[in-house]
Amino acid sequence: MKTVQDYIRTIVDFPHEGIMFRDVTTLFADPRGFRIAIDQMLHPYAGLQIDKVVGLEARGFILGGAIAHQLSKGFVPIRKKGKLPGKTISEAYTLEYGEAIVEIHDDAIQPGEKVLVVDDLLATGGTAEAGIKLIERLGGEIISTSFIIDLPDLGGRARLEAMGVEVNALCAYEGL
């Protein structure tokens, strides 16, 4: 039987020389691979109360939507600044060369709601940390984070765990 990693394509020297880009679009395109990934991402949360699933832009929308559907729960997107209509709150985070800002609708999470945060890849953890801060500012409680891929050498897992947040990933790749 194939594993999730069997469906992930590696592209050498993309987007820069020396980078091994882990492309999950091949996983999404395969119905069996996609089903395996969603089922495995759901497994740790069987029996837990989850009120909302939050997906981080952009591939977190694909995963989060599928997971929310399976759980019969609402889905909430966290988007780049300026992409959500209506009233939002924002959180800045640092990139390698500069800063980025993500936003969430100010009424998307109600105080006390239990939230699962989903994305395809955990690298430095900056986007996930910013998203978690937004959810917590709205009064949400982070149940866990779930990723397809963890790049442990980039420190994202340690960063989120230092915040007291549980991290689950289906697979890990060493290096960049």
Swiss-Prot record:
Catalytic activity: AMP + diphosphate = 5-phospho-alpha-D-ribose 1-diphosphate + adenine
Pfam families associated with the record: Pribosyltran
Alphabetical list of InterPro entries matching this protein: Ade_phspho_trans, Adenine_PRTase, PRibTrfase_dom, PRTase-like
Pathway this chain belongs to: Purine metabolism; AMP biosynthesis via salvage pathway; AMP from adenine: step 1/1
Claim: Transferase is one of the keywords in the record: yes
Top-level taxon in the UniProt lineage: Bacteria
EC number: 2.4.2.7
GO terms for MF: adenine phosphoribosyltransferase activity
Subcellular locations according to the entry: Cytoplasm
Cytoplasm as UniProt keyword: yes
A GO-annotated cellular component: cytoplasm
Record keywords, A-Z: Cytoplasm, Glycosyltransferase, Purine salvage, Transferase
GO BP field: adenine salvage; AMP salvage; purine ribonucleoside salvage
Disulfide feature: none
Gene3D superfamilies attached to this UniProt entry: 3.40.50.2020
Functional note: Catalyzes a salvage reaction resulting in the formation of AMP, that is energically less costly than de novo synthesis.
Similarity field: Belongs to the purine/pyrimidine phosphoribosyltransferase family.
Record text on subunit structure and interactions: Homodimer.
Protein name, UniProt field: Adenine phosphoribosyltransferase
